[in-house]
Amino acid sequence: MSPARLPISRESCLTIPAGFSPSALLDSPVLLTNFKVEPSPTTGSLGMAAILHKSAHPDMLPSPRDKSVRNAHEDRGSRDFEFKPHLNSSSQSLAPAMSDLKKHEHSMQNQSMNPSSSSSNMVNENRPPCSRESSLTVNVSAQNQPVGMVGLTDSMPAEVGTSEPQQMNSSDNAMQEPQSENVADKSADDGYNWRKYGQKHVKGSENPRSYYKCTHPNCEVKKLLERAVDGLITEVVYKGRHNHPKPQPNRRLAGGAVPSNQGEERYDGASAADDKSSNALSNLANPVHSPGMVEPVPASVSDDDIDAGGGRPYPGDDATEEEDLESKRRKMESAGIDAALMGKPNREPRVVVQTVSEVDILDDGYRWRKYGQKVVKGNPNPRSYYKCTSTGCPVRKHVERASHDPKSVITTYEGKHNHEVPAARNATHEMSAPPMKNVVHQINSNMPSSIGGMMRACEARNYTNQYSQAAETDTVSLDLGVGISPNHSDATNQMQSSGPDQMQYQMQTMGSMYGNMRHPSSMAAPAVQGNSAARMYGSREEKGNEGFTFRATPMDHSANLCYSSAGNLVMGP
């Protein structure tokens, strides 16, 4: 190899320490900052004086990177020598190294005179087993043969024509490229079968997130995978552990296998040796970053661990990321099933009352508040909804007219009242018999004073309609129509005690006194009848006499439902 093709580092500036002569550079074809020392093809000397001088004064190194690299040399009892850069070297190890290098310098000069001894030292038998150390062996050949073979146990390429900045870049790229290829290769198949069930954009991430689930029955392991636009996987998160072994290769889902990076990474000796041989110079330039220093990843990854692909643990700060889509769907379905099973509390039996009325609202003794109205299917008449106004009472009812009979009102009650029937309002009492009271006043105003005084006894009396409902039954009973007066028994007893003869005598006397009286306008007085059909007073126009007369009719006491006055008639709703 010609000296022009030897690796020569090109620095932007070169600092020459004091007391150093530039003529020392002629002894070696490499610069001071390059520690990959090779013997001179012309003289065979190594020119280590400058290197030893710089090792004794580390503060005079021209490059900050060289300050962190120290060389420790050991004599292994052979004619070869090795440069072994250590991560944690110090200046204390430089003192014995100086004496060792002097001995190696003399041995190398003797070695150049004996060409036959160079062929027996091509392979280093004392290679250190530690993978974190990189060894460099320099073999010296005959004086008239150019020496350019630098290598480890394996053979190296013949041409090494890269500069030191390019070596640094290649070392960084050599670290990044295996990682990206590793992720792509490891993510191709992890040995399990996955099924994709969702994809969405999450907060704080530019790439969409895909959700996968293990296809094995009863396996709850899920996987969250983020893939960039170019197809590179940026993040993989596993949730849970597999409760089954890996399926057989022939049973794997080849087409639908989802990339992931679960599994154990192992580096055998052959692959490690290949990495060292291909990146020997870059490892010497930057020994901290080495592919051989990658530690194996545990086989299973849980929620609390970092995934093998360099991802981060599953984030829990965002509420939308805590649960995946399938778990949300399952929860919603289970909630719907629970709601369907539980349902609403068991409703009380419904009670339907159908009556014929001109008005929709029937007075059943309770107070109601209307809270809605709508038209139901199959009935053109609207349905009104009412609620009991009593506090805490759950009873409701809805009133509607029948579709087949507009005069029929259907009232449906739901629930039971938990309170007594409220007291009737005054408006209800006054509305019970106002028509009869008006008729009596008309009679009194149109009659003479004597007859009007007699008819005052016929003024209407107000009585309360009594509605009853069983406390613990599902039937609502409404007493519609004519009510029974509470003074009915007293009036009946008085009528019976007077006797039919006495009553007839009194009525005949009154007729004789006012028989000759004529009313200016012939007004027919309304006949007030009880259930016995007894007519106590009335007006009758006869052919011969057109005067106002009274006629007493014998009363039927068997019915026992007569009334002493017109006020006993109670109007129904």
From Swiss-Prot:
Tissues where this protein is expressed: Expressed in endosperm, but not in leaves.
Region annotation (Disordered) ranges: 56-133, 157-192, 240-332
Cellular component per GO, a single term: nucleus
Record's compositionally biased regions (Basic and acidic residues): 64-85, 183-192, 263-277
Biotechnology: Expression of barley SUSIBA2 transcription factor in rice yields plants with increased starch content and reduced methane emission.
InterPro entries for this protein: WRKY_dom, WRKY_dom_sf, WRKY_plant
Record flagged with keyword Flavoprotein: no
Key words of the record: DNA-binding, Metal-binding, Nucleus, Repeat, Transcription, Transcription regulation, Zinc
Superkingdom of the organism of origin: Eukaryota
Signal peptide: none
Compartments it resides in: Nucleus
SMART domains, alphabetized: WRKY
Protein name: WRKY transcription factor SUSIBA2
